[in-house]
Amino acid sequence: MSKPDVVIVGGGSAGAVLAARLSEDPDRSVLLLEAGPAYPPGGYPPEVANPAMLGPRTGRDWDDMTEPGVIGHPIPAGRGKILGGSSAVNGAVALRALPSDFARWADRGLKGWAFGEVLADYLALENTTGGDDRWHGRRGPLPVRQFTRDDLSPMQQAFMDAAVANGITTTSDLNGPVPAGVAPLPVNIVDGIRINTGMAYLGAAVRRRPNLQIRADVVVDRITFSGSRTTGVILAGGTALEGAEVVLSAGTYGTPAVLLRSGVGPSADLRALGISVVGDLPVGQNLQDHPIYFNTYAARPDRIGAQAPPIAVMATTASSHAAPGDFDIHLGATHLFDPSQSPTGAGFALTVAMVRPTATGTLTLAGRDPNQAPRIDLNLLGTSEDRARLLEGLRLARRIGATSPLADFADSELNPGAGATSDADLEASMLATVSTYHHPASTVPMGSEGDPRAVVNRLGEVRGLEGLRVVDASIFPDVPSMPINLSVLMAAEHIARLAY
């Protein structure tokens, strides 16, 4: 393939979707570049196929770390380095962004992304048998299975009951018209296998297309330009590849790093590194992620019973700070717990995620070497409002943990511990142990022509440049208030449908 029509950088949640959809046209040649390995659709190793293995435990992670920031300590910034990207190493939760997320984007002037305008793309990616036909897809590439109460562990069933006892309603479908309440999760897991986009979208027949070439184990350094026109990419090591159009789908961390090394970003930062400025744009300046806290318990070994599935239930609710239609707190009950940390040899965690952060962080280059990790400052809990929201969620989780039947499974609370009662105690514990929900977004945000934060337009085209597009979670104007993987697939479906 001498000069493909489209070069896609990154074969993850968005890139695999784009490669499959764009190569449906036999007259369009597509080159997909992936930094990690490319396994056959049915040949992913057990540590990747197993949905209980997450992030670094899969052995296919970038192993980046965040800056210490407000919380005072670095945390892993996991992203998948494999064909399938982060969809191959995540929790396989198949949830959509809320209508209120898209309404918020529209309020900022973004057109074409109202919930009613993207619902068709959510349906196009989905293959499920449950739910209402108006809300669910039946023939898409990604299989989605709805856990039922019977699928949950005894502890997770008790969590549902204790949540209801604390005023949280039940819902039958977190992807349906009423996405508030507690329910078992929809997941892209089939027969115990996490189905990533490298399997679902890049099946054997797709990979055999003569107009699609997949190159694995190649790291892209930067994009090349002739004036303002994209001409191709340069790989780490110096190999140049031509392309009529370049699409960056390297993820919220990878995409802005490539742009910055290419001279697209804040001009002062680029000049400080000796990089010639091609486009002075606010790349990397609007990073957001969801903070998550683990309220952990030592379990009674005689009561805990089966400890699988690890992630299978969630409650969505609103703090006192939430806007109408927003659900800014997610609570979960998980068996992702190291039993060596419990005096009883068993335990569980209630997760508390705050999914409408007001704080923004940054992604900047530490240097020009494409193999050097960028500086990732998530600025988790960087505002008093974010800390107040998470604190409300933690207090609710503790009430649920102290309510039967869930309380009957616990021997004692480990984090924050029974002695932590005041707001100051709890905030100190939050800062010391908070982590990321691993939903980073918004480093290359979409926006209207007049939006000073925007780097790309509604179809992912980079402002002021030709032949360069971005399609991944980095283009979200802000982080959606749900796990983002399904929305990344939706965005790729949406732009593939409208732009090509």
PLM features per residue range, with description:
Residues 276, 383-409, 428-432:
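Flavin-binding catalytic cores
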Residues 106-222, 226-230, 294-298, 306, ...:
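Conserved redox-cofactor binding core of oxidoreductases
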Residues 47-50, 63, 182-193, 215-216, ...:
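A glycine-rich dinucleotide-binding beta-alpha-beta segment and adjacent secondary-structure elements
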Residues 27-29, 36-41, 223, 232-307, ...:
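Glycine-rich loop(s) and the adjacent beta-strand/alpha-helix scaffold that form part
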Residues 163, 274-276, 395-401, 492-500:
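Internal hydrophobic alpha-helix adjacent to the cofactor/substrate pocket in enzyme cavities
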Residues 2-123, 272, 276-290, 294-297:
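N-terminal glycine-rich phosphate/pyrophosphate-binding loop and immediately adjacent elements
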Residues 12-17, 150, 252-253, 475, ...:
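Residue-level detector of alpha-helix initiation sites
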Residues 292-395, 434-442, 470-473, 477-479:
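FAD cofactor-binding and catalytic pocket of flavoenzymes
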